[in-house]
Amino acid sequence: MRQWTAIHLAKLARKASRAVGKRGTDLPGQIARKVDTDVLRKLAEQVDDIVFISGTNGKTTTSNLIGHTLKANNIQIIHNNEGANMAAGITSAFIMQSTPKTKIAVIEIDEGSIPRVLKEVTPSMMVFTNFFRDQMDRFGEIDIMVNNIAETISNKGIKLLLNADDPFVSRLKIASDTIVYYGMKAHAHEFEQSTMNESRYCPNCGRLLQYDYIHYNQIGHYHCQCGFKREQAKYEISSFDVAPFLYLNINDEKYDMKIAGDFNAYNALAAYTVLRELGLNEQTIKNGFETYTSDNGRMQYFKKERKEAMINLAKNPAGMNASLSVGEQLEGEKVYVISLNDNAADGRDTSWIYDADFEKLSKQQIEAIIVTGTRAEELQLRLKLAEVEVPIIVERDIYKATAKTMDYKGFTVAIPNYTSLAPMLEQLNRSFEGGQS
Protein backbone atom coordinates (compact mmCIF):
# COMPACT_ATOMS: atom_id res chain seq x y z
CA MET A 1 0.00 0.00 0.00
CA ARG A 2 2.85 2.40 0.87
CA GLN A 3 4.54 1.76 -2.49
CA TRP A 4 1.27 2.25 -4.40
CA THR A 5 0.65 5.55 -2.61
CA ALA A 6 4.21 6.75 -3.22
CA ILE A 7 4.03 6.01 -6.95
CA HIS A 8 0.63 7.62 -7.47
CA LEU A 9 1.54 10.77 -5.51
CA ALA A 10 4.76 11.00 -7.53
CA LYS A 11 2.85 10.81 -10.81
CA LEU A 12 0.43 13.50 -9.64
CA ALA A 13 3.39 15.69 -8.66
CA ARG A 14 4.90 15.22 -12.12
CA LYS A 15 1.67 16.35 -13.80
CA ALA A 16 1.35 19.35 -11.48
CA SER A 17 4.98 20.36 -12.00
CA ARG A 18 4.68 20.19 -15.78
CA ALA A 19 1.39 22.07 -15.70
CA VAL A 20 3.21 25.10 -14.25
CA GLY A 21 6.02 24.89 -16.81
CA LYS A 22 8.63 22.98 -14.81
CA ARG A 23 10.38 19.76 -15.82
CA GLY A 24 9.24 17.62 -12.89
CA THR A 25 12.37 15.46 -12.85
CA ASP A 26 13.26 15.53 -9.14
CA LEU A 27 10.03 16.43 -7.33
CA PRO A 28 8.19 13.13 -7.99
CA GLY A 29 11.12 11.17 -6.61
CA GLN A 30 11.44 13.42 -3.58
CA ILE A 31 7.77 12.92 -2.70
CA ALA A 32 7.84 9.16 -3.33
CA ARG A 33 10.93 8.69 -1.16
CA LYS A 34 9.25 10.45 1.76
CA VAL A 35 6.18 8.21 1.52
CA ASP A 36 8.12 4.97 0.95
CA THR A 37 11.84 4.99 1.72
CA ASP A 38 12.23 1.64 -0.08
CA VAL A 39 10.46 2.61 -3.31
CA LEU A 40 13.63 2.79 -5.44
CA ARG A 41 14.94 -0.54 -4.14
CA LYS A 42 11.60 -2.26 -4.85
CA LEU A 43 11.34 -0.91 -8.41
CA ALA A 44 14.98 -1.71 -9.18
CA GLU A 45 14.43 -5.34 -8.17
CA GLN A 46 12.02 -5.71 -11.10
CA VAL A 47 14.77 -4.95 -13.67
CA ASP A 48 17.23 -7.56 -14.97
CA ASP A 49 20.11 -5.28 -16.02
CA ILE A 50 20.92 -1.94 -14.43
CA VAL A 51 23.77 0.09 -15.94
CA PHE A 52 25.18 3.07 -14.04
CA ILE A 53 27.18 5.69 -15.97
CA SER A 54 29.45 7.94 -13.92
CA GLY A 55 32.60 10.07 -14.10
CA THR A 56 33.44 13.77 -14.20
CA ASN A 57 32.82 14.56 -17.87
CA GLY A 58 30.81 12.79 -20.55
CA LYS A 59 28.18 11.05 -18.39
CA THR A 60 25.20 12.55 -20.19
CA THR A 61 26.49 12.02 -23.72
CA THR A 62 27.50 8.45 -22.93
CA SER A 63 24.16 7.73 -21.25
CA ASN A 64 22.16 9.26 -24.10
CA LEU A 65 24.10 7.33 -26.75
CA ILE A 66 23.35 4.09 -24.90
CA GLY A 67 19.70 4.99 -24.40
CA HIS A 68 19.18 6.14 -27.98
CA THR A 69 20.80 3.01 -29.43
CA LEU A 70 18.70 0.65 -27.31
CA LYS A 71 15.50 2.51 -28.20
CA ALA A 72 16.48 2.64 -31.89
CA ASN A 73 16.53 -1.15 -31.76
CA ASN A 74 13.11 -1.33 -30.08
CA ILE A 75 14.45 -2.24 -26.64
CA GLN A 76 12.33 -0.76 -23.86
CA ILE A 77 14.36 0.86 -21.08
CA ILE A 78 14.25 3.02 -17.98
CA HIS A 79 16.48 6.03 -18.63
CA ASN A 80 17.00 9.26 -16.70
CA ASN A 81 17.74 11.09 -19.94
CA GLU A 82 16.52 14.42 -18.57
CA GLY A 83 19.74 14.74 -16.58
CA ALA A 84 18.39 14.31 -13.03
CA ASN A 85 21.24 12.12 -11.83
CA MET A 86 20.91 12.15 -8.04
CA ALA A 87 18.76 9.91 -5.82
CA ALA A 88 15.47 11.79 -6.32
CA GLY A 89 15.85 12.08 -10.09
CA ILE A 90 16.80 8.42 -10.44
CA THR A 91 13.77 7.44 -8.36
CA SER A 92 11.56 9.59 -10.61
CA ALA A 93 12.86 7.79 -13.71
CA PHE A 94 12.05 4.36 -12.25
CA ILE A 95 8.56 5.48 -11.20
CA MET A 96 7.65 7.10 -14.51
CA GLN A 97 9.13 4.51 -16.86
CA SER A 98 8.79 1.12 -15.13
CA THR A 99 6.59 -1.42 -16.92
CA PRO A 100 6.39 -5.23 -16.65
CA LYS A 101 8.23 -5.46 -20.01
CA THR A 102 11.08 -3.11 -19.07
CA LYS A 103 14.13 -5.16 -18.11
CA ILE A 104 17.02 -2.71 -18.67
CA ALA A 105 17.74 0.53 -16.82
CA VAL A 106 20.33 3.02 -18.10
CA ILE A 107 21.11 5.43 -15.29
CA GLU A 108 23.45 8.41 -15.31
CA ILE A 109 24.61 8.93 -11.73
CA ASP A 110 26.38 11.87 -10.15
CA GLU A 111 29.71 10.80 -8.63
CA GLY A 112 28.75 12.24 -5.26
CA SER A 113 25.48 10.27 -5.20
CA ILE A 114 27.05 6.84 -5.67
CA PRO A 115 27.36 5.99 -1.93
CA ARG A 116 23.76 6.98 -1.23
CA VAL A 117 22.14 5.31 -4.24
CA LEU A 118 24.11 2.06 -3.91
CA LYS A 119 22.56 1.55 -0.49
CA GLU A 120 19.30 1.00 -2.40
CA VAL A 121 20.34 -0.28 -5.84
CA THR A 122 23.14 -2.59 -6.92
CA PRO A 123 23.76 -2.20 -10.66
CA SER A 124 24.81 -5.16 -12.76
CA MET A 125 27.46 -3.00 -14.42
CA MET A 126 29.01 0.45 -14.02
CA VAL A 127 30.94 2.38 -16.64
CA PHE A 128 33.28 5.21 -15.64
CA THR A 129 34.31 7.84 -18.18
CA ASN A 130 37.09 9.86 -16.51
CA PHE A 131 37.97 11.72 -13.34
CA PHE A 132 39.01 15.38 -13.43
CA ARG A 133 38.85 18.18 -10.93
CA ASP A 134 35.22 19.26 -10.89
CA GLN A 135 33.43 20.82 -7.93
CA MET A 136 35.94 20.41 -5.15
CA ASP A 137 33.78 22.12 -2.56
CA ARG A 138 31.33 19.24 -3.17
CA PHE A 139 33.54 16.22 -3.76
CA GLY A 140 36.99 16.95 -2.33
CA GLU A 141 40.15 16.11 -4.22
CA ILE A 142 40.14 13.38 -6.82
CA ASP A 143 42.06 10.86 -4.70
CA ILE A 144 39.52 11.09 -1.89
CA MET A 145 36.59 10.83 -4.29
CA VAL A 146 38.00 7.79 -6.13
CA ASN A 147 38.80 6.03 -2.85
CA ASN A 148 35.25 6.66 -1.61
CA ILE A 149 33.77 5.25 -4.81
CA ALA A 150 36.03 2.18 -4.65
CA GLU A 151 34.96 1.52 -1.06
CA THR A 152 31.29 1.87 -1.94
CA ILE A 153 31.29 -0.49 -4.94
CA SER A 154 33.66 -3.16 -3.58
CA ASN A 155 32.47 -6.74 -3.09
CA LYS A 156 29.06 -6.16 -4.70
CA GLY A 157 29.57 -8.32 -7.79
CA ILE A 158 29.37 -5.33 -10.15
CA LYS A 159 30.96 -5.65 -13.58
CA LEU A 160 33.14 -2.54 -14.01
CA LEU A 161 33.76 -1.03 -17.45
CA LEU A 162 36.81 1.17 -17.03
CA ASN A 163 38.66 3.70 -19.17
CA ALA A 164 42.08 2.03 -19.32
CA ASP A 165 43.70 5.30 -20.40
CA ASP A 166 42.77 7.22 -17.23
CA PRO A 167 44.88 6.08 -14.24
CA PHE A 168 42.30 7.54 -11.84
CA VAL A 169 39.56 5.38 -13.37
CA SER A 170 41.83 2.36 -13.70
CA ARG A 171 42.41 2.46 -9.93
CA LEU A 172 38.85 1.20 -9.48
CA LYS A 173 39.95 -2.27 -10.64
CA ILE A 174 40.58 -3.08 -6.97
CA ALA A 175 36.80 -2.93 -6.41
CA SER A 176 35.70 -5.87 -8.59
CA ASP A 177 36.81 -9.23 -9.93
CA THR A 178 35.04 -8.58 -13.23
CA ILE A 179 36.67 -5.79 -15.23
CA VAL A 180 36.32 -4.80 -18.88
CA TYR A 181 38.66 -2.11 -20.22
CA TYR A 182 38.16 0.28 -23.10
CA GLY A 183 40.70 2.72 -24.49
CA MET A 184 42.42 4.35 -27.42
CA LYS A 185 45.54 3.23 -29.24
CA ALA A 186 48.59 5.48 -29.21
CA HIS A 187 48.52 7.96 -32.11
CA ALA A 188 44.83 7.26 -32.80
CA HIS A 189 44.34 11.03 -32.87
CA GLU A 190 46.44 14.07 -32.11
CA PHE A 191 44.62 15.80 -29.27
CA GLU A 192 45.58 19.34 -28.45
CA GLN A 193 47.89 19.39 -25.46
CA SER A 194 46.61 21.43 -22.53
CA THR A 195 48.56 23.45 -20.00
CA MET A 196 46.38 21.82 -17.32
CA ASN A 197 47.67 18.56 -15.88
CA GLU A 198 46.02 16.38 -13.30
CA SER A 199 48.16 14.41 -10.86
CA ARG A 200 50.24 11.82 -12.68
CA TYR A 201 51.35 9.90 -9.60
CA CYS A 202 50.92 6.17 -9.16
CA PRO A 203 47.93 5.29 -6.94
CA ASN A 204 49.79 2.24 -5.62
CA CYS A 205 53.17 3.60 -4.58
CA GLY A 206 53.07 7.37 -5.10
CA ARG A 207 55.88 7.47 -7.67
CA LEU A 208 55.55 9.63 -10.77
CA LEU A 209 53.89 7.58 -13.52
CA GLN A 210 55.91 7.01 -16.67
CA TYR A 211 53.99 7.73 -19.89
CA ASP A 212 54.68 5.95 -23.17
CA TYR A 213 52.05 8.11 -24.85
CA ILE A 214 49.77 10.96 -23.71
CA HIS A 215 46.45 11.67 -25.41
CA TYR A 216 45.65 14.69 -23.19
CA ASN A 217 45.93 15.65 -19.52
CA GLN A 218 46.53 12.40 -17.57
CA ILE A 219 44.82 10.31 -20.27
CA GLY A 220 47.20 7.99 -22.09
CA HIS A 221 49.43 4.90 -21.90
CA TYR A 222 51.29 4.74 -18.58
CA HIS A 223 53.20 2.39 -16.31
CA CYS A 224 54.99 2.40 -12.97
CA GLN A 225 57.95 0.52 -11.49
CA CYS A 226 55.60 -1.09 -8.96
CA GLY A 227 53.57 -2.82 -11.69
CA PHE A 228 50.58 -0.48 -11.96
CA LYS A 229 49.99 0.11 -15.67
CA ARG A 230 47.55 0.81 -18.45
CA GLU A 231 45.73 -2.48 -19.01
CA GLN A 232 45.04 -3.95 -22.44
CA ALA A 233 41.67 -2.74 -23.72
CA LYS A 234 39.03 -5.18 -24.96
CA TYR A 235 37.33 -2.41 -26.95
CA GLU A 236 39.65 0.08 -28.61
CA ILE A 237 39.63 3.02 -30.99
CA SER A 238 42.44 2.58 -33.50
CA SER A 239 41.88 5.92 -35.26
CA PHE A 240 39.33 8.67 -35.70
CA ASP A 241 38.72 11.95 -37.50
CA VAL A 242 36.69 14.98 -36.44
CA ALA A 243 35.69 17.78 -38.83
CA PRO A 244 33.84 18.66 -36.64
CA PHE A 245 31.76 15.43 -36.47
CA LEU A 246 33.26 12.12 -35.36
CA TYR A 247 34.27 9.34 -37.73
CA LEU A 248 35.43 6.47 -35.52
CA ASN A 249 37.23 3.19 -36.07
CA ILE A 250 36.31 0.93 -33.13
CA ASN A 251 37.56 -2.67 -33.26
CA ASP A 252 37.91 -2.31 -37.06
CA GLU A 253 34.31 -1.14 -37.53
CA LYS A 254 33.63 2.40 -38.86
CA TYR A 255 31.05 4.75 -37.28
CA ASP A 256 30.03 7.99 -39.03
CA MET A 257 28.49 10.03 -36.21
CA LYS A 258 26.67 13.34 -35.88
CA ILE A 259 28.35 14.53 -32.68
CA ALA A 260 31.29 16.91 -32.64
CA GLY A 261 34.38 17.31 -30.48
CA ASP A 262 37.34 14.95 -30.30
CA PHE A 263 36.78 14.42 -26.56
CA ASN A 264 33.45 12.76 -27.44
CA ALA A 265 35.36 9.85 -28.98
CA TYR A 266 35.90 8.48 -25.47
CA ASN A 267 32.20 8.93 -24.64
CA ALA A 268 31.20 7.05 -27.78
CA LEU A 269 33.65 4.29 -26.91
CA ALA A 270 32.28 4.04 -23.36
CA ALA A 271 28.75 3.72 -24.78
CA TYR A 272 29.94 1.12 -27.30
CA THR A 273 31.53 -0.90 -24.48
CA VAL A 274 28.28 -0.96 -22.49
CA LEU A 275 26.23 -1.95 -25.53
CA ARG A 276 28.59 -4.78 -26.49
CA GLU A 277 28.55 -6.07 -22.91
CA LEU A 278 24.74 -5.98 -23.03
CA GLY A 279 24.95 -8.28 -26.05
CA LEU A 280 24.40 -5.93 -29.00
CA ASN A 281 26.38 -6.50 -32.21
CA GLU A 282 28.20 -3.93 -34.35
CA GLN A 283 25.39 -3.40 -36.85
CA THR A 284 22.83 -2.89 -34.10
CA ILE A 285 25.10 -0.33 -32.45
CA LYS A 286 25.70 1.40 -35.79
CA ASN A 287 21.93 1.80 -36.21
CA GLY A 288 21.91 3.87 -33.03
CA PHE A 289 25.22 5.71 -33.25
CA GLU A 290 24.71 7.00 -36.78
CA THR A 291 21.22 8.36 -36.05
CA TYR A 292 22.05 10.05 -32.74
CA THR A 293 22.00 13.85 -32.51
CA SER A 294 22.35 15.93 -29.38
CA ASP A 295 19.49 18.10 -28.14
CA ASN A 296 20.63 18.71 -24.57
CA GLY A 297 23.35 21.33 -24.82
CA ARG A 298 26.19 18.85 -25.22
CA MET A 299 27.84 19.66 -28.56
CA GLN A 300 24.45 20.71 -29.91
CA TYR A 301 24.49 22.36 -33.34
CA PHE A 302 22.18 25.08 -34.70
CA LYS A 303 21.86 26.65 -38.14
CA LYS A 304 19.51 29.26 -39.57
CA GLU A 305 20.29 30.62 -43.01
CA ARG A 306 23.99 31.60 -42.80
CA LYS A 307 24.22 31.81 -39.02
CA GLU A 308 25.56 28.79 -37.10
CA ALA A 309 26.06 27.99 -33.43
CA MET A 310 27.33 25.24 -31.17
CA ILE A 311 26.68 24.91 -27.43
CA ASN A 312 28.59 22.71 -25.00
CA LEU A 313 28.41 22.47 -21.23
CA ALA A 314 31.69 23.16 -19.38
CA LYS A 315 31.83 22.89 -15.60
CA ASN A 316 35.51 22.22 -14.95
CA PRO A 317 38.90 22.91 -16.59
CA ALA A 318 38.85 19.81 -18.80
CA GLY A 319 35.34 20.59 -20.06
CA MET A 320 36.25 24.21 -20.75
CA ASN A 321 39.39 23.23 -22.65
CA ALA A 322 37.40 20.78 -24.75
CA SER A 323 34.83 23.46 -25.61
CA LEU A 324 37.51 26.00 -26.51
CA SER A 325 39.19 23.38 -28.71
CA VAL A 326 35.98 22.98 -30.71
CA GLY A 327 36.25 26.67 -31.56
CA GLU A 328 39.75 26.06 -32.87
CA GLN A 329 38.46 23.39 -35.23
CA LEU A 330 35.92 25.78 -36.76
CA GLU A 331 37.14 27.84 -39.68
CA GLY A 332 36.44 31.55 -40.02
CA GLU A 333 35.30 34.11 -37.48
CA LYS A 334 33.68 33.19 -34.17
CA VAL A 335 31.79 34.97 -31.44
CA TYR A 336 31.87 33.43 -27.98
CA VAL A 337 29.33 33.64 -25.19
CA ILE A 338 30.68 32.15 -21.97
CA SER A 339 28.67 31.95 -18.76
CA LEU A 340 29.82 31.36 -15.19
CA ASN A 341 27.29 30.99 -12.38
CA ASP A 342 28.15 30.15 -8.78
CA ASN A 343 24.82 28.74 -7.62
CA ALA A 344 24.76 25.77 -5.25
CA ALA A 345 24.50 23.23 -8.08
CA ASP A 346 27.50 24.81 -9.83
CA GLY A 347 29.75 24.76 -6.79
CA ARG A 348 30.57 28.03 -5.06
CA ASP A 349 34.27 27.79 -5.84
CA THR A 350 34.84 29.10 -9.36
CA SER A 351 38.63 29.24 -9.10
CA TRP A 352 38.80 26.34 -11.56
CA ILE A 353 38.61 28.84 -14.43
CA TYR A 354 42.24 29.74 -13.68
CA ASP A 355 43.23 26.16 -14.53
CA ALA A 356 41.44 26.30 -17.89
CA ASP A 357 43.50 27.21 -20.94
CA PHE A 358 41.81 30.46 -22.05
CA GLU A 359 45.14 31.50 -23.52
CA LYS A 360 44.34 29.37 -26.58
CA LEU A 361 41.66 31.93 -27.57
CA SER A 362 44.40 34.33 -28.64
CA LYS A 363 45.11 32.00 -31.58
CA GLN A 364 41.54 32.13 -32.90
CA GLN A 365 39.80 34.59 -35.21
CA ILE A 366 37.22 36.07 -32.81
CA GLU A 367 34.87 39.03 -33.33
CA ALA A 368 33.95 39.36 -29.65
CA ILE A 369 33.61 37.43 -26.40
CA ILE A 370 30.47 38.02 -24.33
CA VAL A 371 30.78 36.99 -20.68
CA THR A 372 27.67 36.44 -18.60
CA GLY A 373 26.28 34.87 -15.44
CA THR A 374 26.62 35.74 -11.77
CA ARG A 375 30.43 35.70 -12.06
CA ALA A 376 30.72 37.45 -15.42
CA GLU A 377 33.26 39.95 -14.10
CA GLU A 378 35.52 37.13 -12.93
CA LEU A 379 35.45 35.66 -16.43
CA GLN A 380 36.32 39.08 -17.81
CA LEU A 381 39.33 39.25 -15.48
CA ARG A 382 40.45 35.74 -16.42
CA LEU A 383 40.35 36.64 -20.13
CA LYS A 384 42.36 39.80 -19.51
CA LEU A 385 44.97 37.76 -17.62
CA ALA A 386 45.07 35.41 -20.61
CA GLU A 387 45.86 38.48 -22.78
CA VAL A 388 43.02 37.77 -25.17
CA GLU A 389 43.06 40.87 -27.38
CA VAL A 390 39.45 40.96 -28.58
CA PRO A 391 36.44 42.99 -27.39
CA ILE A 392 35.14 41.49 -24.11
CA ILE A 393 31.53 42.45 -23.37
CA VAL A 394 29.97 41.96 -19.92
CA GLU A 395 26.23 41.19 -19.89
CA ARG A 396 25.11 39.45 -16.70
CA ASP A 397 21.72 38.46 -18.11
CA ILE A 398 22.27 35.10 -19.82
CA TYR A 399 19.30 35.46 -22.18
CA LYS A 400 20.43 38.89 -23.39
CA ALA A 401 24.06 37.81 -23.68
CA THR A 402 23.14 34.77 -25.78
CA ALA A 403 20.76 36.75 -27.99
CA LYS A 404 23.49 39.34 -28.60
CA THR A 405 25.61 36.77 -30.46
CA MET A 406 23.07 36.94 -33.29
CA ASP A 407 24.33 40.48 -34.02
CA TYR A 408 27.61 38.97 -35.26
CA LYS A 409 28.21 37.12 -38.52
CA GLY A 410 30.65 34.62 -37.05
CA PHE A 411 29.93 31.13 -35.76
CA THR A 412 28.54 31.34 -32.21
CA VAL A 413 30.37 29.18 -29.67
CA ALA A 414 28.24 29.05 -26.51
CA ILE A 415 29.81 27.69 -23.33
CA PRO A 416 27.61 27.59 -20.21
CA ASN A 417 28.35 26.04 -16.85
CA TYR A 418 25.77 23.88 -15.09
CA THR A 419 22.95 26.27 -14.09
CA SER A 420 23.68 28.50 -17.09
CA LEU A 421 22.84 25.73 -19.52
CA ALA A 422 19.03 25.92 -19.43
CA PRO A 423 18.68 29.68 -20.11
CA MET A 424 21.43 29.70 -22.74
CA LEU A 425 19.93 26.71 -24.55
CA GLU A 426 16.44 28.20 -24.34
CA GLN A 427 17.63 31.43 -25.94
CA LEU A 428 19.49 29.61 -28.72
CA ASN A 429 16.35 27.62 -29.49
CA ARG A 430 14.42 30.91 -29.75
CA SER A 431 17.08 32.59 -31.89
CA PHE A 432 17.32 29.66 -34.28
CA GLU A 433 13.60 28.85 -34.36
CA GLY A 434 12.68 27.53 -37.78
CA GLY A 435 16.26 26.57 -38.54
CA GLN A 436 18.26 23.37 -38.17
CA SER A 437 19.25 21.86 -34.84
From Swiss-Prot:
Keywords annotated in UniProt: ATP-binding, Cell shape, Cell wall biogenesis/degradation, Ligase, Metal-binding, Nucleotide-binding, Peptidoglycan synthesis, Zinc
Tagged with keyword Membrane: no
GO molecular function list: acid-amino acid ligase activity; ATP binding; carbon-nitrogen ligase activity on lipid II; zinc ion binding
GO biological process, one term: peptidoglycan biosynthetic process
Pathway recorded for this protein: Cell wall biogenesis; peptidoglycan biosynthesis
Positions with a binding annotation for Zn(2+): 202, 205, 224, 226
pH dependence of activity: Optimum pH is 7.5-7.8 for isoglutaminyl synthase activity.
EC numbers on record: 6.3.5.13
Catalytic residue list: 349
One Pfam family recorded for the sequence: MurT_C
Null mutant phenotype: The gatD-murT double mutant displays susceptibility to diverse carbapenem and cephalosporin beta-lactam antibiotics and shows increased susceptibility to plectasin.
Catalyzed chemical reaction(s): beta-D-GlcNAc-(1->4)-Mur2Ac(oyl-L-Ala-gamma-D-Glu-L-Lys-D-Ala-D-Ala)-di-trans,octa-cis-undecaprenyl diphosphate + L-glutamine + ATP + H2O = beta-D-GlcNAc-(1->4)-Mur2Ac(oyl-L-Ala-D-isoglutaminyl-L-Lys-D-Ala-D-Ala)-di-trans,octa-cis-undecaprenyl diphosphate + L-glutamate + ADP + phosphate + H(+); beta-D-GlcNAc-(1->4)-Mur2Ac(oyl-L-Ala-gamma-D-Glu-L-Lys-D-Ala-D-Ala)-di-trans,octa-cis-undecaprenyl diphosphate + ATP = beta-D-GlcNAc-(1->4)-Mur2Ac(oyl-L-Ala-gamma-D-O-P-Glu-L-Lys-D-Ala-D-Ala)-di-trans,octa-cis-undecaprenyl diphosphate + ADP; beta-D-GlcNAc-(1->4)-Mur2Ac(oyl-L-Ala-gamma-D-O-P-Glu-L-Lys-D-Ala-D-Ala)-di-trans,octa-cis-undecaprenyl diphosphate + NH4(+) = beta-D-GlcNAc-(1->4)-Mur2Ac(oyl-L-Ala-D-isoglutaminyl-L-Lys-D-Ala-D-Ala)-di-trans,octa-cis-undecaprenyl diphosphate + phosphate + H(+)
Stored PANTHER family: LIPID II ISOGLUTAMINYL SYNTHASE (GLUTAMINE-HYDROLYZING) SUBUNIT MURT (PTHR23135:SF7), MUR LIGASE FAMILY MEMBER (PTHR23135)
Annotated function: The lipid II isoglutaminyl synthase complex catalyzes the formation of alpha-D-isoglutamine in the cell wall lipid II stem peptide. The MurT subunit catalyzes the ATP-dependent amidation of D-glutamate residue of lipid II, converting it to an isoglutamine residue.
Complex formation: Forms a heterodimer with GatD.
Family named by the database record: Belongs to the MurCDEF family. MurT subfamily.
Domain notes: Composed of two domains: a Mur ligase middle domain containing the canonical ATP binding site and a ribbon-type zinc finger, and a C-terminal Mur ligase domain. The GatD/MurT complex has an open, boomerang-shaped conformation in which GatD is docked onto one end of MurT. Both proteins contribute to the catalytic triad.
Protein name per UniProt: Lipid II isoglutaminyl synthase (glutamine-hydrolyzing) subunit MurT
Organism: Staphylococcus aureus (strain N315)
